[in-house]
Amino acid sequence: MKTQPLISVCIPVFSTEPYLLQCLRSAYRQDFNAFEIVVVSDASRGKDSNGRTAKKLIKIAQKECNRFRKQNNLSPVQIRFIEHRENRGLIEVRRTLCTQSCGIYITQLDSDDEMEEGALSAMYSVAESTGFDIIHGTSIAGTFDENNNFIPQEQNRYGVIYYGTIEGRNVFRNWIINNDLTANTWGKLIKRELFLKAYENIPYTECNMADDFLLFFFLSQYAKSYIGIQNKVYRYRVNTGMTSHRLIDSLHKWKMICSAASVFTVISSWLENHQKNENKDQNQNDNTVYLLPDEMEKLRAKARYYILNNIQQMRERVVPELLPQAREMLCEYWGEDFVKLVEKVIDSHQEEQ
């Protein structure tokens, strides 16, 4: 009988094949036993510098993995590969990763990033001793030189972490109100059952923006415990990922961006279905879910941030011939009145400068 892995390392791929093998090596070289690696390609057509597809790179990595772990007296690690037939966006890629994984815990690893040595051991030892839902490790942001040497930045604004423990509803509040931690799912060890619970509340959503915000909104709603640890577990590669600043030359690419509006539609729908009297005592153990006024204002502020970002990207990155259709699509997602209002604010601000 096959033993259930303790951890699933979940890796999404879209146009990141040049970095995939390096990413996989950082995963299978972990000094931890009883884990698996699950890779999902979101219909990616990319290739590495040697013309190899993600599927081919997985086969190479599996052979390397078998040899490395045998030589170092480590248990075998299976690398499983799944491929979407059509591009669905990060929310759905992570859904597939979660449903197809077998581990008790999940850690997300973006395919252009790397894990630090000993990352799985460090996070799991804390998970085992505390039983906490979310273990958040320290990440380092930086770039890689031509020899693949990592050059860290002095500051890391991508992986804000709260060092210490948070319990109950404060997990949500420390994130949404205090900004004590970032919503990224990478660099964290999270119970798989918590991911599945979160996805129960997220309908099929094609989106590449605000995906972490949507997922962590529900993860933090249902999480009972969080701990941030000093151990360095993750290397974040700056400005190369799935959603980096590339030219937008197709309406499908644009849809994956302006559909950030769907994130707030999902949350609004959930609130309508579950919201109770906001003045009700939060300490009652009746599984009541609702948001306080300051939390609602944070949500509205985040929505304003994303529509502002969408309009700026439309003006700066969408090719001219697609602009009329792109703006029409933006209005379909966000509402024409809202788009006009934000455009007016942007133009007014630019005139003042």
Question: What is the meaning of each model-derived region?
Answer:
Residues 15-29:
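Short, well-formed alpha-helical segments that are part of the catalytic scaffolds
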Residues 26-83:
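Acidic donor-binding segment of Leloir-type glycosyltransferases
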